[in-house]
């Protein structure tokens, strides 16, 4: 086996395990998007952590997604950041499959709901990389 490290080769952060699935769900609902690039540093809640009042509808989608992940963690042994699940994308429609266990089904529905929310929310480039201390208290 060959291991190649790309650390430092790109300014884009690697996706934690299952977040690649969330990334692909967003691509399903917003074809042509680059979710990890477009949404990882948006508003007060899109990306790592979150606090304060969401700056707009899209940021509220991220806040709701964060809250959903908090709820998922209440299931025994359920880690939403690493939990893989089964889903399908067909012509922009996402379906969480019935073979998911309770944790996977919950996380899948968190991601599905967020991807649909993202697709419906306006994207304001002024809300990318905002001053969190000034806008998110």
Curated annotation (Swiss-Prot):
Q: What is the tissue localization of expression for this protein? A: Expressed by the venom gland.
Report the protein name in the record.
Acidic phospholipase A2 PL-I
Q: What class of enzyme is it?
A: hydrolase
InterPro entries associated with the record: PLipase_A2, PLipase_A2_Asp_AS, PLipase_A2_dom, PLipase_A2_dom_sf, PLipase_A2_His_AS
Q: Its function?
A: Snake venom phospholipase A2 (PLA2) that may act in the hemostasis system of the prey. Exhibits hydrolytic activities, and prefers the anionic micelles (dPPC with deoxycholate) (793 umol/mg/min) to the zwitterionic micelles (dPPC with Triton X-100) (591 umol/mg/min). PLA2 catalyzes the calcium-dependent hydrolysis of the 2-acyl groups in 3-sn-phosphoglycerides.
State the active site: 65, 111
Record carries keyword Ligase? no
Asked whether the UniProt record includes Cytoplasm among its keywords, one would answer no
Q: Which UniProt keywords apply?
A: Calcium, Disulfide bond, Hemostasis impairing toxin, Hydrolase, Lipid degradation, Lipid metabolism, Metal-binding, Secreted, Signal, Toxin
Location, primary (coarse class) = secreted
């Amino acid at each position: 086996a060959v291991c190649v490290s790309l650390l430092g080769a790109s300014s884009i952060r690697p996706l934690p395990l299952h977040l690649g699935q969330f990334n692909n769900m967003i691509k399903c609902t917003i074809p042509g998007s680059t979710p990890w690039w477009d949404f990882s540093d948006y508003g007060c809640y899109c990306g790592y952590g979150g606090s304060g009042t969401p700056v707009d509808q899209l940021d509220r989608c991220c806040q709701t997604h964060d809250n959903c992940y908090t709820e998922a963690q209440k299931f025994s042994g359920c880690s939403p950041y690493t939990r893989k699940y089964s889903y399908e994308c067909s012509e922009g429609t996402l379906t969480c499959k019935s073979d998911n266990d309770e944790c996977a089904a919950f996380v899948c529905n968190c991601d599905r709901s967020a991807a649909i929310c993202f697709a419906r929310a306006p994207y304001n480039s002024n809300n990318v990389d905002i001053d969190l201390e000034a806008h998110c208290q």
